Swiss-Prot record:
Belongs to the frataxin family. It holds the Pfam family Frataxin_Cyay. The keyword Cytoplasm does not apply. It comes from Rickettsia akari (strain Hartford). Involved in iron-sulfur (Fe-S) cluster assembly. May act as a regulator of Fe-S biogenesis. This is Iron-sulfur cluster assembly protein CyaY. GO terms for cellular component: cytoplasm.
Length: 101
């Protein structure tokens, strides 16, 4: 994947995460703040940071629950080195259904 493709897919993914939270978080318990390539999610569990790392062609997640993790794009999914998917981790930790992507 070239840099342009990575950037487009990563931007779509971060926008999807943002939009999904805003649609499903009816109680507004998650404060969503997107600044450029960095998405901050302030929750009752702590602050999540999700950002794209163009040089590595990865999305990085810093979670107050599961810690830091890097995800690469493979077969239409963002996966970490042990095969866990970004959307599955976010679904479990935030109680928001991200599995429609």
């Amino acid at each position: 994947m070239n840099n342009t493709e990575f950037s487009k897919i990563a931007d779509i993914t971060i926008a999807y995460i943002t939009d999904t939270i805003e649609e499903q978080d009816k109680e507004a318990s998650i404060d969503v703040d997107l600044q450029g390539d960095i998405l901050n999610l302030d929750t009752d569990k702590g602050i999540y940071v999700i950002n794209k790392q163009s040089a590595a062609k990865e999305i990085w997640l810093s979670s107050p629950v599961s810690g830091p993790c890097h995800f690469f794009y493979e077969q239409g999914k963002w996966k970490n080195r042990v095969g866990l998917e970004l959307m599955a981790i976010l679904t479990e930790e935030l109680d928001i259904d991200f599995n429609n992507v």
